Amino acid sequence: MGFTVDVANRLVTVDHSHNNYSVTTPAGNPTVLTLSNGLKVTSIFSRTKGKKGKRGVKAPPGDNSPMLYALKGMHQLQTTRRAVMDLNLSYRQILPVYVAAGFQWDWLLPLPSSSNLTALFANRVCSRSGVGVCHHGAMVKISAQQVLKNLEALQIKATDRSAIREAVNRFIKYNSPQTAFQIKAISRTSLRPYINPLMWGHLPAVVPPRRVLLIDDMVTTGTSLVCASDILRHRYPTVQIEALTLFGSTK
């Protein structure tokens, strides 16, 4: 089953007759992706290409991830209780497949987000699996102002630097220099790996972990997950890391 977008009513629902945007049945899930730094990322629901509209017709809202946007309340999209129940039914069958694969984590670390969806997903994984402890706030986003400061030290092409600066300044225009920067504000995905959008946050005094499971709502370029894993390895050199996301990549 996939997702159907009712553009007129800004409503996203689960549809059993196709796999547009995502495969949400236990069959075919979870999926695995390996990022550039070797990080293994498992996704509960794989993503597919949405149904293409006719030439000249505006694409449906949601940037090819309409259900994610609906769950986060973005683009004025919404969903139904029935659709959430359908997804949860599949999730409860898919998660045990990942747990049974053998990676037993000490910590679950949700990545910071402007929405509470990632935190809720992390809590659900923790309670459903009964494995590890969930630590919120271990990773935080850097400010847009800090992104601009870091940009000056990067040894990259002048054209790339200019494009990133333009994207960050556009973000600041609609927010503020102190606002936590959102990596998706850089529309050219090839430029995102130049930016480290995260830094270490705060954790109470705890025993260093042997294994950590990073949690995010979706993986696209994987920039944030790569940065988070690099931060962890710098702090805990021997730690083993994997990542789990709600929705996968369309790659």
Q: Where are the language model's segments positioned?
A:
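Active-site-facing substrate-recognition patch
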Residues: 3-107, 123, 137-208, 251
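A structural signal for isolated positions on well-ordered beta-strands in alpha/beta enzyme cores
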Residues: 107, 213, 242-244
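Gly/Ser/Thr-rich loops at beta-strand to alpha-helix junctions
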Residues: 112-119, 219-223
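Active-site signature of alpha/beta-hydrolase-fold catalytic machinery across serine-
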Residues: 124, 227-231
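Long compositionally biased, domain-poor regions of proteins
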Residues: 127-137
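A phosphate-binding catalytic loop at a beta-strand-loop-alpha-helix junction
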Residues: 214-228
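ATP-dependent adenylation/pyrophosphate-handling site
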Residues: 231-251
